[in-house]
């Protein structure tokens, strides 16, 4: 609702929309909490919930690592990306810093199809880093559920994103989103603040690869060096309500 009042996003209607901004309110989409429920999901390796994810979620990571041919190690920082592979999704930012992103501690699992340049980009990196990158150039709902349950973090560096659903699903599975502050991503992900231990994800403002990598590295620091704070952030994310009932109530 705020972005469409700007010249960049307003498509010529920004003046009218700005004049009537008091009449507008953005309402985000919802997700099906029955379909996306780690406690009952039959598509994941091991079920879990907010009370026991500390002891059970990692099993999903190890099993997915084994299935995809990655190095099996629960201590690896697994980042998931489930997306249409298009310019909108910020994939050029990933390309610019990929060699720094997938260090010895990090794995990236990609699921999606789209523009050939990005499909081939991820295929190349999977060839270059076979133990660290898994490029699944397809869409498999079963595999997507497994990744939501297995990953530690979920990357969405979108150029623009009117709402977005995958960050909501990742919250549901205790997977921490790393997003660019645009559209619905800004509305749904509250940036982590280490000073008051608040927030439920990580975000960066500018469409800039180095800024994105800096935030990813910061998230890894919290994951490895401040595990209690990380788990508390997961708790807050899983407690969010992005069901359709919540969206209906706001409407």
Each PLM stretch: what is its role?
Residues 1-251:
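Catalytic cores of nucleotide-sugar-dependent glycosyltransferases that transfer UDP/GDP/TDP-activated
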């Amino acid at each position: 609702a705020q972005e469409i009042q700007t010249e960049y996003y307003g498509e010529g209607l920004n003046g009218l929309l700005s004049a009537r901004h008091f009449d507008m309110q953005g309402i985000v989409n919802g997700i099906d909490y029955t379909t996306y429920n780690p406690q009952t999901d039959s598509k994941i390796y091991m079920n879990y919930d907010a009370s026991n994810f500390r002891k059970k979620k990692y099993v999903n990571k190890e099993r997915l690592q084994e299935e995809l041919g990655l190095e099996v190690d629960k201590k690896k920082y697994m980042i998931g990306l489930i997306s249409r592979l298009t310019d909108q999704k910020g994939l050029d930012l990933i390309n610019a810093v990929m060699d720094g992103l997938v260090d010895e501690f990090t794995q990236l699992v990609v699921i999606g199809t789209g523009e050939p340049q990005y499909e081939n980009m991820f295929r190349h990196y999977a060839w270059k880093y076979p133990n660290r990158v898994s490029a699944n150039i397809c869409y498999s709902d079963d595999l997507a559920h497994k990744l939501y349950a297995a990953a530690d973090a979920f990357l969405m560096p979108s150029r623009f994103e009117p709402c977005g659903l995958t960050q909501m699903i990742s919250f549901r599975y205790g997977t921490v989103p790393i997003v660019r502050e645009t559209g619905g991503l800004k509305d749904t992900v509250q940036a982590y603040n280490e000073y008051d231990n608040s927030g439920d994800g990580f975000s960066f403002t500018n469409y800039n690869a180095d800024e994105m990598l800096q935030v990813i590295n910061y998230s890894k620091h919290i994951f490895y060096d401040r595990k209690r704070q990380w788990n508390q952030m997961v708790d807050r994310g899983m407690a969010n309500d992005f069901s359709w009932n919540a969206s209906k109530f706001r409407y």
